[in-house]
């Protein structure tokens, strides 16, 4: 079992990565003893893992569950209220703990519910998708979507522990696994050139779910994110680099309707647009764009935006992006493999050229 620490002073917490961790009561015991436990999961994950985690936690306290519909389109205030209603109807107090058992949608909603309920109760992340294991479960970003924008209603709220059981990936649909790889590849582009090269060399091992390769890839992503979050918890500086591909990607998700494009698929296409923007600005050359595209394609990810999206569609959503400051769209762009920066002087004419030529 691999352990990584997210250093945030009194809000520090561990990430555990390994196999069969959902049956490891010893690791969870210190976070659950004498607490009432409410597990939040969805209709897809519940038949696979809910009974197992309930049995693991039953010796520590009273365990109940809430099962939500599965999909990004249900990450909204209405379904957040379902969690609040369960907590209130069953008289959960401040000594309770919420457990997020699922992917990024469940993790984001459960964390936001924990941040809000009685002004804050403990929560635990048990991510079951690759995307949530390498990205959304770490760092304390919690939110729900609004019809006008993704993750617009939320809070920074850190979990007590992140428990990553890599065996969950064996029940993950291939499309979901590929979507997670978009976030994995992002770390190589924006932070670690050696990791990017390792990914290029280990495509087959990862696609065949080689245990050693999975643990290494997930661990390296979590190490990078833990490092970044420890430096900049609330995204005032370096943490913004983790949004590589996301400004374009969030526009795709919002325009196409949440759930039609998976988050990772939109990030993949958005990462290519970011790379093409960087090339248009003279920050990188064509060879780097090609390496990025080839690696994304190796994992069966989309490398272009939907044909139905034009420049006006993109710019409307990008102007609402959370990184906008003083009315200026700010983009995270690669400056090399392994490096990225935030740029606020990208003109709309440059963006139009990139989007129209993509």
UniProtKB/Swiss-Prot annotation:
Q: Which residues bind Zn(2+)?
A: 183, 246, 263
GO annotation, cellular component aspect: cytoplasm
**A Pfam cross-reference name:** DHQS_C
Note on how the cofactor is bound:
Binds 1 divalent metal cation per subunit. Can use either Co(2+) or Zn(2+).
Annotated InterPro entries: Dehydroquinate_synthase (IPR050071), DHQ_synth_AroB (IPR016037), DHQ_synth_fam (IPR030963), DHQS/DOIS_N (IPR030960), DHQS_C (IPR056179)
Q: Which residues bind NAD(+)?
A: 70-75, 104-108, 128-129, 141, 150, 168-171
MF (Gene Ontology):
3-dehydroquinate synthase activity; metal ion binding; nucleotide binding
Lineage, top-rank taxon, reads Bacteria
Entries under CDD domains matching the protein? DHQS
Q: Which residue windows are coiled coil?
A: none
Identify the pathway: Metabolic intermediate biosynthesis; chorismate biosynthesis; chorismate from D-erythrose 4-phosphate and phosphoenolpyruvate: step 2/7
Q: Which keywords, in A-to-Z order, does the entry hold?
A: Amino-acid biosynthesis, Aromatic amino acid biosynthesis, Cobalt, Cytoplasm, Lyase, Metal-binding, NAD, Nucleotide-binding, Zinc
What this protein catalyses is: 7-phospho-2-dehydro-3-deoxy-D-arabino-heptonate = 3-dehydroquinate + phosphate
The prosthetic group or cofactor this protein requires is: Co(2+); Zn(2+); NAD(+)
Q: Where in the cell is it found?
A: Cytoplasm
One record GO biological process: aromatic amino acid family biosynthetic process
Q: State whether keyword Acyltransferase applies.
A: no
Q: What is its EC number?
A: 4.2.3.4
Which enzyme class?
lyase
TM ranges are none
Q: What does this protein do?
A: Catalyzes the conversion of 3-deoxy-D-arabino-heptulosonate 7-phosphate (DAHP) to dehydroquinate (DHQ).
Give the record's family classification: Belongs to the sugar phosphate cyclases superfamily. Dehydroquinate synthase family.
What is the protein name stated in its UniProt record? 3-dehydroquinate synthase
Q: Which organism is it from?
A: Shewanella baltica (strain OS195)
